[in-house]
Amino acid sequence: YFTLDTLEYLAKGGRIGAVGALLGSIFGIRPIIHVLEDGNLEPYDKVRTRKKALKRLLEIANEQGELEEIFIPNALVPEDAEYFRAEMAARHPGVPIWITQIGTPLAAHLGPGAIGLFVRQKAK
């Protein structure tokens, strides 16, 4: 799951319309985007403010049960990545946490300020 700092890059990439991006920006909408197994992006939730978006990503990750690994890809927001690391380490001690930069193709659609929180569940 990802959240974005701005809708501008989704509009530039043709993923949403210019009017939707403008209205989303005016109202402070921060989408939560689900990355499907095939790599496609799907809207999952919407919240107002970045702080609420970060908290929502943590909620989603913590609903996944016992974890094997945690991945935090980000686009130029190391302070948010460290916040996620601290929160997830406290909740899931001993689970490896990897902070990475978002790859260029995905970053071109998501823009700077994008951050994700991906988890791998332990096999049952």
What are the residue ranges of the model-derived segments?
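Mixed-charge interfacial surface used for oligomerization/domain docking
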Residues: 1-124
